[in-house]
């Protein structure tokens, strides 16, 4: 990669990102702009995938809201994400947990990792 691009992206990388993997439960504090106001919206769910490296890395969080599955993809180094909290570490054997989309209720639970 071009050294100039590397220098610019290095300044934009965040260093306050916790270590989390697919299967972990996270609480994402996202900044939402509504007209003139800016507020923090919580999005809590299971990380079903992480993708990419560097400034373009993303992760997808899935939660069930009113019986409907909701997935939201966040850029890992986005300034719109105020903070990421890991609430629970899950033990899974896959990097992409797309199979959770077909599961409901107790079948969609993920075993907690023993640390």
Curated annotation (Swiss-Prot):
One of its GO terms (biological process) is translation. GO terms for molecular function: structural constituent of ribosome. InterPro entries: Ribosomal_bL19, Ribosomal_bL19_CS, Ribosomal_bL19_sf, Translation_prot_SH3-like_sf. GO terms for cellular component: cytosolic large ribosomal subunit. Keywords: Ribonucleoprotein, Ribosomal protein. It comes from the Bacteria. This protein is located at the 30S-50S ribosomal subunit interface and may play a role in the structure and function of the aminoacyl-tRNA binding site. NCBIfam families: rplS_bact. Belongs to the bacterial ribosomal protein bL19 family. This is Large ribosomal subunit protein bL19. It comes from Lacticaseibacillus paracasei (strain ATCC 334 / BCRC 17002 / CCUG 31169 / CIP 107868 / KCTC 3260 / NRRL B-441). The gene is rplS.
């Amino acid at each position: 990669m071009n050294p100039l691009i590397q220098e610019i992206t290095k300044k934009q990388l965040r260093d306050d990102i916790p270590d989390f993997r697919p299967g972990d439960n996270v609480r994402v504090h996202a900044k939402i702009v509504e007209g003139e106001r800016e507020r923090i919206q919580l999005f809590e769910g299971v990380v079903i995938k992480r993708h990419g490296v560097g400034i373009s890395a993303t992760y997808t969080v899935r939660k069930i809201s009113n019986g409907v599955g909701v997935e939201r993809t966040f850029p890992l180094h986005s300034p719109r994400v105020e903070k990421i909290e890991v609430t629970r570490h899950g033990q899974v054997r896959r990097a992409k947990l797309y199979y959770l989309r077909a599961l409901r209720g107790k079948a969609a639970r993920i075993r907690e990792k023993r640390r």
